[in-house]
């Protein structure tokens, strides 16, 4: 991405789509998405999330229109200065207190939405660093995550996988970016 930035030119790209891939070969996709998200720290960059339009067995999503529309939103906001919600929610901060974590996001538009039922794809880990499914619910403009067994939370992940079953969106129908608070490489 750095190499495409010359002067004040804008670089807008999509983020790696959901994909199962081959075991042992494509297991680093969450880490690649994480690095892609960090690239937003580079000036004159914007990104559209394609996680929810991917195909389980094809890295190239057939739904190109949705990806294109999301890239266009990013261009309208970043290049043309339109005041609109152009990105899905991005984790800003996590407050952990005992067996509960409150996750705060940027880019929520008018609020957060759980598409197709209760929130999914949230995991928590304690001192043992073993991630387990967690209960999550929208709490105002944040998400509250709780460990199912009441154990203390040390770390939180969302949609951390090659083809996660994630469903957190903002009011503009844009999906939340996967994230993790840990630095465990698995």
Per-range role (PLM):
Residues 32-121:
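Catalytic cores of secreted or luminal carbohydrate-active enzymes
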């Amino acid at each position: 991405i750095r190499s495409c930035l010359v002067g004040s030119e804008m670089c807008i790209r999509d983020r790696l789509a959901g994909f199962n891939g081959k075991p042992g070969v494509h297991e680093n996709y969450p880490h690649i998405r994480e690095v892609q998200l960090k690239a937003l720290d580079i000036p004159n960059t914007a990104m559209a999330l394609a996680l929810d339009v991917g195909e389980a067995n094809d890295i190239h999503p057939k739904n190109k229109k949705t990806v294109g529309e999301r890239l266009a939103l990013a261009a309208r906001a970043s290049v043309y200065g339109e005041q609109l919600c152009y990105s899905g929610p991005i984790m800003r901060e996590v407050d952990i207190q005992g067996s509960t974590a409150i996750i705060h996001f940027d880019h929520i538009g008018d609020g957060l939405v759980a598409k197709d039922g209760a929130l999914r794809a949230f995991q928590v880990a304690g001192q043992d660093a073993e991630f387990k499914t967690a209960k999550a619910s929208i709490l105002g403009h944040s998400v509250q995550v709780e460990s199912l067994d009441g154990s203390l939370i040390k770390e939180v992940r969302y949609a951390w996988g090659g083809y996660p079953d994630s469903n957190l969106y903002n009011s503009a129908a844009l999906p939340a970016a996967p994230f993790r608070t840990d630095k465990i490489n698995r």
